[in-house]
């Protein structure tokens, strides 16, 4: 009964032309394809080589994975909005800190750290109008996952755990960047 009412309402709106679906044109296959690198489903060896050699932004405002919370405070406290001091929270051995920033292209930075107070996760939000094109963040040909709104790079460097750089935003311009250690139980190496 309810589905019939919804169907009738949808049909009515379509007939009188009030729904965006009734006015939108069906995109051609060329328009709807998301740009995908040719190796996205490539053999493991090719993806590994890409992760080892990719050129991609691995720091935000000078912070990298493995930095200490003390280093993060030294860099971000002075950039913080005085009306919004950093917010800290502990959850087990993990620590979380949020900075609302005043004098950068970023409006906020959120980090998580491990039991050694080393950063394992960074999430940064860009201000409106300060979005960064995916191509300026990294080599899009070496990103195994991407579409028009999201791109993800795997990064593997000597003596470092596998980590991931992810950018999100409309029209291949990031308004949000996340860098994090990929946790693989039983396979993790300590980052010193």
Residue ranges and their predicted role:
Residues 1-10:
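Bacterial N-terminal signal peptides that target proteins for export
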Residues 6, 40-45, 107-110:
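Short hydrophobic/aromatic-rich motifs at helix boundaries and adjacent loops
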Residues 97-113:
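Short, compositionally biased low-complexity segments enriched in polar/charged residues
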Residues 9-18:
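Bacterial N-terminal signal peptides
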Residues 25-94, 98, 115-192:
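Non-cytosolic coordination micro-motifs
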Residues 18-26:
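Bacterial Sec-dependent signal peptides at the C-terminal "C-region" and cleavage site
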């Amino acid at each position: 009964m309810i589905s019939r009412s919804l169907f009738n309402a949808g049909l009515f709106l379509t007939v009188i032309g009030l729904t965006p679906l009734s006015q939108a044109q069906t995109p051609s296959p060329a328009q709807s394809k998301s740009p995908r690198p040719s190796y996205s489903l490539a053999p493991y060896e090719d993806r590994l080589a890409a992760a080892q050699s990719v050129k991609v932004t691995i720091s935000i405002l000078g912070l990298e994975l493995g930095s200490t919370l003390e280093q993060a405070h030294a860099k971000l406290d002075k950039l913080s909005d005085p009306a919004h001091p950093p917010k800290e929270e502990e959850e087990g051995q993990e620590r979380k800190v949020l900075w609302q920033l005043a004098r950068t292209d970023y409006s906020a930075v959120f980090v998580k750290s491990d039991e050694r107070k080393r950063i394992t996760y960074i999430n940064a939000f860009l201000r409106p109008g300060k979005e960064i094109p995916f191509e300026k963040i990294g080599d899009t040909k070496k990103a195994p996952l991407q579409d028009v709104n999201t791109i993800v790079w795997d990064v593997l460097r000597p003596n470092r755990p596998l980590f991931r750089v992810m950018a999100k935003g409309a029209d291949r311009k990031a308004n949000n960047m996340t860098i994090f250690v990929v946790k693989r139980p039983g396979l993790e190496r300590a980052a010193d």
